[in-house]
Amino acid sequence: MQVILLDKVAHLGSVGDQVTVKSGFARNFLIPQGKAVMATAANIAHFEARRAELEAKAAEALAAAQARAAKIAEIAAVSVSATAGDDGRLFGSISAKDIADALTAAGVAVAKSEVRLGEGPLRTTGEHEVKVHLHPEVNAAVTVNVVAE
């Protein structure tokens, strides 16, 4: 199925690209999320009329993500406390939601879906490097210091 992308989609393309995707991916994800429209003659003409508006919106989103990444770089580290045993292992774990809440409390609004924990939830005390994926082109890193209560 041919679609026109209205937003940058990872591993697929950027604003305005006409791409061929599987029908289910288009019908169940791209079109309902507002990331694409079917590539009909009417939609192509409508898109060309709105191209500048959509590109400006994409540039604005990129600038906002870069500003948030700069704020995260200023913070550099956040501290999260949890109950732990004598050997440093936590009773439970620190999830992406806990890290997002700590970053939001530090002054940068971050959603839990933007926090990337490469090896799953944090289960030990100490410092851990965590990546924050703010935009397809913007990533930031923050150090999470897990402290025992």
UniProtKB/Swiss-Prot annotation:
GO terms for cellular component: ribonucleoprotein complex; ribosome. Pfam families: Ribosomal_L9_C, Ribosomal_L9_N. One of its GO terms (molecular function) is structural constituent of ribosome. PROSITE patterns: RIBOSOMAL_L9. Disulfide bonds: none annotated. The keyword Ribonucleoprotein applies. GO terms for biological process: translation. InterPro entries: Ribosomal_bL9, Ribosomal_bL9/RNase_H1_N, Ribosomal_bL9_bac/chp, Ribosomal_bL9_C, Ribosomal_bL9_C_sf, Ribosomal_bL9_N, Ribosomal_bL9_N_sf. Keywords: Ribonucleoprotein, Ribosomal protein, RNA-binding, rRNA-binding. SUPFAM superfamilies: L9 N-domain-like, Ribosomal protein L9 C-domain. Belongs to the bacterial ribosomal protein bL9 family. Binds to the 23S rRNA. PANTHER family: 50S RIBOSOMAL PROTEIN L9. HAMAP family: Ribosomal_bL9 (MF_00503). NCBIfam families: L9. This is Large ribosomal subunit protein bL9. It comes from Actinobacillus pleuropneumoniae serotype 3 (strain JL03). The gene is rplI.
